[in-house]
């Protein structure tokens, strides 16, 4: 009777390992593109482009942090291929975005496209939240997934739309008044707003993880006990 239970635990661990490995690899690739393109603007003559490098770093930190949080709260057997395909698509978006450091017009256009890719990822992941709610009957799991579901909806209905609109507004502003933003260098205010928004979001993710930490441990223990009883 214990063999199937042991197999489920082993498969859960295997899927978690795959997820963490994929996250590390694709964000490592994104970091390579960021550093490779950052070296072309890191001079005093291009100091106005430095915030774009910081914004890129914040994007990587946010994606990695959210991915790890997602893995620790939701990932179990079976492996979710579409979810991982979304991750790869997001990494491609990051790589393309980082090639446009030093080009504010293209940066904000691609930032808008990137937000449009990440936005439906949160909607898709609601399926995984519902799946975990069904196979996790404990009290800790119920509280954990109530918080996770609330966070998913907050991202779908508020945080991602706000980020999308911020980037879209910045892109349209540059297209409407290129001399004001590009020639006169006022694009630094737009990238400054993006950096602040990304920094605030990263702080939110870190604090949210702190709230979930004890519930993640308790839920994993409940999963283990459920597996042992089967």
Where are these regions (language model features)?
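Hydrophobic alpha-helical transmembrane segments and adjacent interfacial helices
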Residues: 25-41, 85-104, 164-178
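Alpha-helical transmembrane segments
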Residues: 44-57, 102-121, 190-198
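Membrane-water interface of transmembrane alpha-helices
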Residues: 59-69, 116-138, 204-215
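Membrane-proximal helix-loop-helix units in multi-pass membrane proteins
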Residues: 88-156
């Amino acid at each position: 009777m214990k063999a199937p239970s042991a197999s489920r635990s082993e498969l859960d661990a295997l899927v978690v390992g795959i997820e963490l490995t994929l996250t590390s690899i694709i964000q490592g690739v994104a970091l390579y593109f960021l550093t490779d393109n950052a070296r072309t603007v890191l001079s005093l003559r291009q100091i106005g482009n430095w915030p774009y490098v910081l914004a890129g770093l914040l994007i990587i930190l946010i994606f990695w942090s959210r991915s790890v949080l997602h893995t620790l709260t939701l990932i179990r057997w079976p492996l979710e291929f579409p979810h991982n395909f979304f991750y790869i698509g997001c990494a491609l978006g990051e790589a393309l975005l980082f090639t446009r450091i030093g080009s504010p017009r293209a940066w904000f256009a691609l930032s808008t496209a990137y937000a449009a890719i990440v936005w439906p990822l949160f909607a898709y992941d609601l399926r995984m939240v519902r799946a975990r709610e069904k196979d996790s009957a404990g009290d800790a799991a119920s509280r954990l997934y109530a918080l996770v579901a609330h966070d998913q909806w907050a991202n779908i209905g508020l945080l991602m739309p706000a980020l999308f609109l911020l980037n879209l507004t910045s892109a349209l502003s540059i297209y409407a008044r290129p001399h004001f933003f590009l020639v006169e260098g006022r694009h630094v205010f737009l990238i400054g707003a993006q950096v602040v928004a990304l920094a605030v979001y990263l702080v939110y993710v870190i604090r949210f993880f702190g709230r979930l930490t004890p519930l993640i441990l308790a839920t994993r223990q409940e999963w283990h006990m459920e597996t042992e009883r089967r």
